[in-house]
Amino acid sequence: MNLPKNTFKLNYITSITIVLLFLTSTVYAQSSDSEQVSYPSYSLFGFVQQQFAEDLTPGSPAGFSIHRARLGVQGKISENISFRFFGGFIEPPQSNPQLVHAYMDYKINSYLNIRAGQFLAPFGIEGNEGIILNPAIERSLTLRRLNTFRMFSDIGVQAFGSLSHFNYAIALVNGTGANRAEQIDPKDFIGRVGFNLTDGLEIGLSGHAGHYLTGQEMNEERARYRAALDVNYKGDPLFVRGELVTRKDNITNSQDVVMNGGYFLAGYKVTDRFETIVRYEHLKPNSDVDNDRLEIITMGANYYLMGRSRISVNYDFRDDKVNEDFENLFTAQLQFVF
């Protein structure tokens, strides 16, 4: 017997809430007994993003929405073992509940850590960091279209660490994305290495090799590859970041589709609470088609209330050479982080 979708969502949300309330009460009891560090230790965290969006594309009405609502728990089981569980009550684009992250880390030393579970795939900057850290309201549309993983995450194992001016993360994952069962035997290999050139300036190289299913009946196994170069300068008051990505999907034994794109973002901290940003992005969904090109210029501002909680405004000037009906987008967002 199939339960209604609303019943499933209610049970899902209720179960998460009960577990998190129990863990929160456990933390409070532990902190009351002693100020010393004890294991296991837990902390509750989460955020809500409420938006007002007006998309000038025909058939897209303006309106308010809860874009994301996430609640999670993280902590340490021992000095070397930590964990993170993060659930989304509402996740784009369908506004349905999803498991965001669920993984455990084992720290051997600063050079080598092992992670197992569902986590952000180590590729580039934007896809490899939490969305609340992005200077813009949303990750660039270019990177979202060049991304191959649902929610930029997948299930597998990862090794990561740092040494002096060098850091790395290498993972072996299913290749199907978050909350999706594996369908084929080959696994995807993905990773990034970063080099800190000076204080606040880092460059990175990323690579991804894997397989996917395609064809009318989704039963044809093909190869796909991605590579990226990123630069990130965390200056004050000026900060900049950018990524260039190329992706190649094997369609048939003799045909490949090559996609290229990237973005450049610059921001300026006017005060401790107020900053402005501008981002340029471009995408060629098929490098063999001359007029197949998308360009977007985003102008925005952030006002920080406390910590990562902020009010943001973005306006996207969008130019799609193929789809002329793809018009500009205005978005205002209240982000509350706790």
What are the residue ranges of the model-derived segments?
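N-terminal periplasmic/intermembrane-space "pro-region" immediately following the signal or transit peptide
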Residues: 1-4, 8, 12, 17-49, ...
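Short strand->helix junction
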Residues: 7, 90-92, 320
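Short, well-ordered amphipathic alpha-helices
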Residues: 30, 193, 333-335
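Outer membrane beta-barrel
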Residues: 33-175, 185-190, 194-202, 265-268, ...
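Outer-membrane beta-barrel pore domains
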Residues: 56-59, 78, 103-107, 115-118, ...
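Glycine- and other small-residue-rich loops at beta-strand/loop junctions that grip anionic moieties
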Residues: 148, 182, 255
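A short secondary-structure junction signal
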Residues: 170-171, 179-183, 204, 215-217
